[in-house]
UniProtKB/Swiss-Prot annotation:
This is Cyclic pyranopterin monophosphate synthase. It comes from the Bacteria. Substrate binds at residues 77-79, 115-116. Its EC number is 4.6.1.17. Pathway: Cofactor biosynthesis; molybdopterin biosynthesis. It comes from Rhizobium meliloti (strain 1021) (Ensifer meliloti). The lineage of its organism: Bacteria, Pseudomonadati, Pseudomonadota, Alphaproteobacteria, Hyphomicrobiales. It is an enzyme of class 4 (lyase).
Length: 164
């Protein structure tokens, strides 16, 4: 069987942390996205700042940033990283209806930051759900995916059809 290999599996088929010691340090950036679909009334509550637990968007933004910094504690084979930047943008979308979440993680180092960006989006979405669940238990988290990455030996990646 040819094609891409799983980098976290050793020759014996066991899970193994990748040795990045010989890789060059380069600027690495990853962007991920996701959404929380909800009832229009729930979105209105959040926009007005009337959710029972407080400012949903600000809290979810902070939760996403904190989560990116803790990725190696949550995902077993991720390296602890010295992130230089994490941003989480949360945008209301009436057409969804709900909130769109985008995270960017950046560093200068020997391994990528895709998992950090994905973790930031995931935890921000979970925080939105937690803070608004009293008003809407039918919320749906979805669309969590890598949008783009740059830097490193494998080169740049941009999801087809995305302009970033």
């Amino acid at each position: 069987m040819s094609g891409p290999a799983l980098t976290h599996i050793d020759s014996a088929g066991e899970a193994s942390m990748v040795d990045v010691g010989d890789k060059a340090e380069t600027v690495r950036v990853a962007v991920a996205e996701g959404f929380v679909r909800m009832k229009p009334e729930t979105l209105a509550l959040i926009r007005q700042g009337n959710a029972k637990k407080g400012d949903v968007i600000a809290t979810a933004r902070l939760a996403g940033i904190m989560a990116a910094k803790q990725t190696s504690s949550l995902i077993p084979l991720c390296h602890p990283l010295m992130l230089t930047k994490v941003s989480v943008d949360i945008t209301p979308d009436d057409a969804l209806p709900g909130l769109r979440v985008e995270a960017m993680a950046k560093l200068t180092g020997r391994t990528g930051v895709e998992m950090e960006a994905l973790t930031a989006v995931s935890v921000a979405c979970l925080t939105i759900y937690d803070m608004a669940k009293a008003a809407d238990r039918e919320m749906e988290i979805g669309g969590v995916r890598l949008v783009s990455k740059s830097g490193g030996r494998s080169g740049d990646y941009h999801r087809a059809g995305e302009m970033r």
